[in-house]
Amino acid sequence: MLKEIRPAIFVLLALTLITGLLYPLAMTGLAVTIFPAQAAGSLITRNGQVIGSALIGQEFKDDRYFHGRPSATSTADPNDSTKTVPAPYNAANSSGSNLGPTSKALADRVKEDVDKLKAENPAQPVPVDLVTTSASGLDPHVSPEAAMFQVPRVAKARGVPEDRVRALVVKNTEGRLIGLLGEPRVNVLALNLALDAATATK
């Protein structure tokens, strides 16, 4: 019987070694060698300090900054471990809201967001990604339209011409991958850092 089982045990051990150890180590080594920044998490630093990742969004509330998409991520309620409380862009708990299209809570939240944005820029239609969450809750990008929509607010809060802020949006707009894949997008953290740098001295 051992003779019949031995090949199966050998294959199990060999595949475990190859796919569980050698392959991951080889891929990690290649990634660190060829794409060191991406392998380290695409971290963004300022003055030598890590302030975020290009792959994970952050919540911005100040009018002087561009805002990202709504985030439905949550964290454990410190007062009741059986419940959760909202924690936007919580990278330790990536998730969507799980609210369906007939949900009153979802409809009320979207309406509230739309009303706030219309008050901010009544002349322009509200871009859909400014009122809808991503599946992960961590999307670091908004559409160019969503960024442009916020230009008047940001420019007013910083006391700079709108054209200057608009030019930064254009400069920080990423195109489709190899011209075909995905949609044009703007990384909110990168844009806000560029905004800080450009307006440090007006």
Curated annotation (Swiss-Prot):
Instruction: Name the residues that span the membrane.
Output: 7-27
Q: Where is this region: Disordered?
A: 66-103
Annotated Gene Ontology cellular component terms: plasma membrane
Database matches in HAMAP family: KdpC
Q: Which NCBIfam families does the UniProt record give?
A: kdpC, PRK00315.1, PRK13999.1
- PANTHER family according to UniProt: POTASSIUM-TRANSPORTING ATPASE C CHAIN, POTASSIUM-TRANSPORTING ATPASE KDPC SUBUNIT
Name under which the protein is recorded? Potassium-transporting ATPase KdpC subunit
Which gene underlies this protein? Answer: kdpC
